[in-house]
From Swiss-Prot:
Family indicated by similarity: Belongs to the enolase family.
Protein name as catalogued: Enolase
Any one GO MF annotation of this record: magnesium ion binding
NCBIfam families: eno
Pathway note: Carbohydrate degradation; glycolysis; pyruvate from D-glyceraldehyde 3-phosphate: step 4/5
Principal subcellular localization: cytoplasm
Length: 431
């Protein structure tokens, strides 16, 4: 047993130059843990509250001094004396201390920072890597990476409506080889875009952010890049999309406006038709947030039409919340959940969401946020839970590569027991 003797938070910066919360946990044994909280650009209405100061004279109102003070002045005294390995007890104590359904009093960014730092300190105390401490000796599956190589929507300053166009190197025999394949396609895409006279600057998540004629054109140039890199789309590499449709859903009309394509006033059924058409024309294996987070009828229709052959991921739809997920499971909506630790605010609740998804036959995709840091905790979480998939950006920007590098270290450490399932990680669809 090693008790917590001090918890300290500070304001640091994320990959967009915005403040976020870093937390350090100290124990009587000398074990130590540190974690930094990520932040999203496109956020679901039902996410746990990210506490910002709102003081326009500091960081344009995005400061997190209040969240930092909540850690140092309220949470720290409460959890001092806890056994650092009592993750569930510590998380529960913070949830009760906050006392709101959405962590709006103390802030999910304050609570999560402590939750993650506690896990790091506990792993340090028992002398195990974080993935092994959290997952035990069954933690051995490396996730299939979903690499966002073209950014659009709120993640880029371009005219592309859909937020992310991803490649999934499912044909690789190992995680290490999947990274090589992804990097080669990424560099091939840069050459393809350059030859077409298109911008090769990158967006928030490290993918390219060119102005394109349509969302379909984004898929076309990626196919060209896959072939240029020497791979075959639909065999070695599949495609995925995070549509983030809540970002272009018109609440006043109840319709979808694809401004980049000049198509407005689309109904839910017309959006579903569009996705079905794209899936016939391209080897798309995963679609995230195809309809607005509150358009459950639309999600139901999408699931009925293509849910047997395409992974349908709920991000804004489920917000890593077991109550939302349980409702989706009951109604037969989507077949996968995106797991973002800061949407719910504690590791304990994160693991509960993953477990609920697996019991229901849903896949779970561990995910970064668009505002990231050098913290690579989610890489360990993906392996600890044998999630099978991870979404953590493109093949550029250190804040994204940090997660891939950590997974490469884990695979190397696991050696022969490491498992990379590739296409088998999409176990609930027909491929």
């Amino acid at each position: 047993m090693s008790t917590i003797i001090d918890v300290y938070a500070r304001e640091v910066l994320d990959s967009r130059g915005n403040p976020t919360v870093e937390v350090e946990v100290y124990t009587e044994s000398g074990a130590f843990g540190r974690a930094i909280v990520p932040s999203g650009a496109s956020t679901g209405e039902h996410e746990a509250v990210e506490l910002r100061d709102g003081d326009k004279s500091r960081y344009l109102g995005k400061g997190v001094v209040n969240a930092v003070n909540n850690v140092n002045e309220i949470i720290a005294p409460e959890i001092a004396g806890f056994d650092v390995t009592d993750q569930a007890g510590i998380d529960r104590a913070m949830i009760e201390l906050d006392g709101t359904p959405n962590k709006g009093k103390l802030g999910a960014n304050a609570i999560l920072g402590v939750s993650m730092a506690v896990a790091h300190a506990a792993a340090d105390f028992v002398g195990l890597p974080l993935y092994r401490y959290l997952g035990g000796f069954n933690a051995k599956q490396l996730p299939t990476p979903m690499m966002n190589i073209i950014n659009g929507g709120s993640h880029a300053d371009n005219n592309v409506d859909f937020q992310e166009f991803m490649i999934l190197p499912v044909g690789a025999p190992t995680f290490k080889e999947s990274i090589r394949m992804g990097a080669e396609v990424f560099h091939a895409l840069k050459a393809v875009l350059h030859d077409k006279g298109l911008n090769t600057a990158v967006g928030d998540e490290g993918g390219f952010a060119p102005n394109l004629g349509s969302n379909r054109e984004a898929l076309e140039v990626i196919i060209e890049a896959i072939e240029k890199a020497g791979y075959k789309a639909g065999e070695n590499v599949f495609l995925g999309m995070d549509v983030a449709s809540s970002e272009f859903y018109n609440k006043e009309t109840g319709k979808y406006d694809l401004a980049g394509e000049g198509r407005t006033g689309l109904t839910s059924a017309e959006m579903v038709d569009f996705y079905e058409e794209l899936c016939k024309d391209f080897p798309i294996i995963s679609i995230e947030d195809g309809l607005d987070e509150n358009d459950w009828d639309g999600h139901k229709l999408l699931t009925e039409r293509i849910g047997d052959k395409v992974q349908l991921v709920g991000d804004d739809l489920f917000v890593t919340n077991t109550q939302k997920l349980a409702e989706g499971i009951e109604k037969g909506i989507s077949n996968s959940i995106l797991i973002k630790v800061n949407q719910i605010g504690t590791l304990t609740e994160t693991f509960e969401a993953i477990e609920m998804a697996k019991r229901a036959g849903y896949t779970a995709v561990v995910s970064h946020r668009s505002g990231e840091t050098e913290d690579a905790t989610i890489a360990d979480i993906a392996v600890a839970t044998n999630a099978g998939q991870i979404k953590t950006g493109s093949m550029s920007r250190t804040d994204r590569i940090a997660k891939y590098n950590q997974l490469l270290r884990i695979e190397d450490e696991l050696g022969e027991v490491a498992v990379y399932d590739g296409v088998k990680s999409f176990y609930n669809i027909k491929r």
